[in-house]
Amino acid sequence: MKVWNARNDHLTINQWATRIDEILEAPDGGEVIYNVDENDPREYDAIFIGGGAAGRFGSAYLRAMGGRQLIVDRWPFLGGSCPHNACVPHHLFSDCAAELMLARTFSGQYWFPDMTEKVVGIKEVVDLFRAGRNGPHGIMNFQSKEQLNLEYILNCPAKVIDNHTVEAAGKVFKAKNLILAVGAGPGTLDVPGVNAKGVFDHATLVEELDYEPGSTVVVVGGSKTAVEYGCFFNATGRRTVMLVRTEPLKLIKDNETRAYVLDRMKEQGMEIISGSNVTRIEEDANGRVQAVVAMTPNGEMRIETDFVFLGLGEQPRSAELAKILGLDLGPKGEVLVNEYLQTSVPNVYAVGDLIGGPMEMFKARKSGCYAARNVMGEKISYTPKNYPDFLHTHYEVSFLGMGEEEARAAGHEIVTIKMPPDTENGLNVALPASDRTMLYAFGKGTAHMSGFQKIVIDAKTRKVLGAHHVGYGAKDAFQYLNVLIKQGLTVDELGDMDELFLNPTHFIQLSRLRAGSKNLVSL
C-alpha cells in the first residue's frame, strides 16, 4: 500500500483535480491520501465512515464546534458518489433535455437548425461529464483541508473493528463515536439477463458506457431517476419506452400538476406503460442486450433494444456494517436510528442515504450536522418532514406541501390560484410566461408548453397549504417559500411581497389580485 502523507502539502484546486485523476486512472488503485494531524493528542470525537455530503458536512460542523474528527472514504475525493456518478450528472443531462426540446419545438424556425431526424449522442454528453467531474472533486479536497481544517484518509476503505475502532492505511484509530455515512447504491432488478452488456444504472452509465446506443431506449422505473434520465434519452431523438410497475411520478401529490407533467412527456413522444413488470432481458450470442420482455395490462410485450436503463431508486449500503456492528435494519435495508440519529449500537450514529428516504441532498447534509451536534453534547433531534421537492423532466418541476386533493381529504375548505386559469381555451394562452418559456408562450401553437403553476390555500385561515410549479427557475424560491409556509404564510402576506417581474412563479401578483377579498374564491 502506497501512502501519500498530504498533511504538509498544500495543493491548489487544479493540482488536486490532477492528482485525483491520476489516482483514479492508476492500474494499481493509486495511493492512499493521508491527511491526519499527528501532532494533535486529542481523541477523536467521531470518525466518519464515508466522506460524501453527510460525512463532509457533519465533519465541518463538528470541527467548527471545537471537536476533532476523521473521515475515512474509499474514494480519492470528498463529496461521495453524488458529484462523481450519481445526482450531478443528471443535471447536465436535464440541461440538454431542456435545450433539445426547445430546438425540436422550433426546428427550422428563427435561428434554430432543422432537427428533423436529428439524433444526439448520449455517449458524447456522458464523455463531457466524465471529462469535467474532477474539478469539483478538487475543490472539495482543497476546501476541506485548507479552509475547514478537516482530517481525512481517502482512497482507502475503512475497516470497522467495533463501535470505537477503525483501521485505515495500516493504522488503528480510536474514537468516542462512529458516524456511519456510506450512502446507498443503485437499486437493481431480479430477472434473467439483468447483467447483460448494455444494461445500465445511473452509476454504470457514467463509468462504463463505451458505445452509442441505438434508436430505442428502455427505461425501467417510474420515479425521479427513471423520469429524469428517460427524458434526456427521449430528447436525444430516440424512441424511449418507460416500463412502470405501478404509476409514474406518484410523488407529485397534486393530480393536475402531475397530469400536466405527464402530458408534456407524452407529447415529446415518450411511451409510458403503467402496470408493467419486466420478466426477462434477452441477450445475443455476445452477451449484449437485444430485447426486454415485460408483462403489461395488454399482455406480453417485447421491445428490441441495445440499451436498458434501470431507474429503480437507491439501496442503502448497510449489509457489511450491520454484520460487523450488529445494527438493526429496516425492511428496505436502511439502518434504523432514533430522532437523535443514534443506531441500536451505543456510540454509533448513522446519517444520509444509509438511513433511508428521503434520499435527498438536504437530508444528507443536515443529518450529518445534527449527528455532529449530538456527538458534541447537544440533545437535538432531526426527522426530515414537510420539505420541498423537485425533479427534472424536460422541465423543472418543483412542489411542496399539499396537493389540492390531499388538502380536501384532510378537511380543508380550499381555493386555488393557478396559471393558466381554467378557461375555454384551456392551456392555449400565453401565460404563464417567464425566463426560459417566452418562446413557448408566444410561439404558434406552443403556448401550452409555457408551464403550469398552482397554489393551494385554506379559504378560512387564508394560509397557503401547498405550491406546485412546472417550468424553469422556480426551484430556488421553493427552498424559502417552504419555510414561510411552515411559519403560517397567508395569501395576504404572499401578495404583499415584492416580485422581480417577470418572475418564474406568479404567486405573488396572483395572490395580490385576491388578497383584498374577505371571502376567497379561486382564480
Curated annotation (Swiss-Prot):
GO terms for molecular function: 2-oxopropyl-CoM reductase (carboxylating) activity. SUPFAM superfamilies: FAD/NAD(P)-binding domain, FAD/NAD-linked reductases, dimerisation (C-terminal) domain. Belongs to the class-I pyridine nucleotide-disulfide oxidoreductase family. Disulfide bonds join C82-C87. The gene is xecC. Keywords: Disulfide bond, FAD, Flavoprotein, NADP, Oxidoreductase, Plasmid, Redox-active center. One of its GO terms (biological process) is propylene catabolic process. Binds 1 FAD per subunit. Coiled coil: none annotated. Homodimer. Component II of the aliphatic epoxide carboxylation complex together with components I, III and IV. Its cofactor is FAD. Pfam families: Pyr_redox_2, Pyr_redox_dim. Pathway: Alkene metabolism; propylene degradation. FAD binds at A53, A54, S81, A158, D353, M361, F501. It comes from the Bacteria. This is 2-oxopropyl-CoM reductase, carboxylating. NADP(+) binds at G222, S223, K224, T225, R245, T246, E360. The active site is a redox-active disulfide bond. 2-KPC reduction and carboxylation assumes the formation of a mixed disulfide between the interchange thiol (Cys-82) and coenzyme M.
